[in-house]
Amino acid sequence: MLRLLKRNIQISKRIVFTILKQKAFKGNHPCVPSVCTITYSRFHCLPDTLKSLLPMSSKTTLSMLPQVNIGANSFSAETPVDLKKENETELANISGPHKKSTSTSTRKRARSSKKKATDSVSDKIDESVASYDSSTHLRRSSRSKKPVNYNSSSESESEEQISKATKKVKQKEEEEYVEEVDEKSLKNESSSDEFEPVVPEQLETPISKRRRSRSSAKNLEKESTMNLDDHAPREMFDCLDKPIPWRGRLGYACLNTILRSMKERVFCSRTCRITTIQRDGLESVKQLGTQNVLDLIKLVEWNHNFGIHFMRVSSDLFPFASHAKYGYTLEFAQSHLEEVGKLANKYNHRLTMHPGQYTQIASPREVVVDSAIRDLAYHDEILSRMKLNEQLNKDAVLIIHLGGTFEGKKETLDRFRKNYQRLSDSVKARLVLENDDVSWSVQDLLPLCQELNIPLVLDWHHHNIVPGTLREGSLDLMPLIPTIRETWTRKGITQKQHYSESADPTAISGMKRRAHSDRVFDFPPCDPTMDLMIEAKEKEQAVFELCRRYELQNPPCPLEIMGPEYDQTRDGYYPPGAEKRLTARKRRSRKEEVEEDEK
């Protein structure tokens, strides 16, 4: 808070000591520099006690300059002041007459007198610094990084300004914000509608909304955190009809944590940098892509052996294949991709892809749109070269987000309609839109999907963060489920949805709720015949955890994850020591910390 004050005090000390204690021999006196540079904007912000210590010439010269406001641009102008001639007379009483002393004792007395004089000046400066009231200077606002100027002509006025400012800061901190609306008012509002949502009785996260101050919200979050049991996760959806028995496919995204932890790691996202391409050429990048595809074959085999028949393929399968300068086609990997397709056809294993967040065909920048079109063509080439059967080829969709809102949602939707016509027919057949957790809700995207015949992926976790005109939580969305399903069935594609849960179930703000949990503990109220992508950090372990909780057989939970009495002689893909990966990350880290403390 007082950083600027300390800086000015140090500057004032530096100014005085530059005049009185300079050891360079300039001019006729060893203590007087020929030219002293003083910043006039800093002179005006010095206290009077420090101004009085400066030589008369610098005071008169600087006082005639216009006063500069103390702000962001105040420390820019500097003026040199020639103090050589004037200071000779003013320092005469400090150092004595300017004449050579013939005796040694006389020189010693002169040096001692100069030392006493400079020490007295230093003491005066320290006293003025100690007595300097910080309330009359700048203080830093607790709500922002910009300094607030409370400097005034009198101390009483400055204290009044400080008190007013602190009251304003407290009022801003206690400013009420809409956290949730009252349940009763929502019931009254919803009673007039045709659809009456079912309000869960045991829902720990209130779907109500009421006005709370920021401080009371923090207290509520602390209380809920204290009462939270780590082994009793919150149920996100308390619907009457859970989709059990589950007849669809449960899947995970991109990475298998168990195979990734093996000594010979199996994963499909090896990548590099452009400098590697420039140094080693495209052949080195193609070798990485070949290794990724070979590991994808192992992943499909592993999934089938453990009952999983749905997975998202990593977009990094072939690094920089869609780059504007270093891009390349995939003829060299045709045979390996066909092998993946044969296994998928054999096991009825669904494969999808999800281009990254920078693939935005609604961007106002033409460069971004061109890159997005190339990226979508690259993803389509991967899936097309697998030569999947008719249904699996339809089900091999490309999921994208609409992106930012930029100038406005209406303008962004118009750009999407325009740039959508630039896509190839093959990409159009695979393209799917997903509601996000920042800008675009289900209600924003559903009319566009109906207009352009694009399926809509419903992400339940994103809907809980950006509910649009509906309430967060689930059941208000139920009337739209048939309309969303129709966007899939009219193109003959098996419907899929995304489900995840927040890593912090007690979080209030959307920013804190976006992070995905390690595993999920509930089912959304969806059709049990569709495909459900579990987006959790523990990947396939989250799928097995869900199967264990609900005793599902699609896929069955492996014995390695059921408990301590599993069969260790079972021939599986679990490497020795991988059972540590079968526990949640936070619980595993706590256990390891306890073991280290005991040692």
UniProtKB/Swiss-Prot annotation:
One annotated GO biological process: UV-damage excision repair
Lineage: Eukaryota, Fungi, Dikarya, Ascomycota, Taphrinomycotina
Biased composition (Basic residues): 97-115, 137-146
Protein name as it appears in the record: UV-damage endonuclease
Coiled coil feature spans: none
Tagged with keyword DNA-binding: no
GO CC annotations on file: mitochondrial chromosome; mitochondrion; nucleus
Transmembrane segments: none
Encoding gene per record: uve1
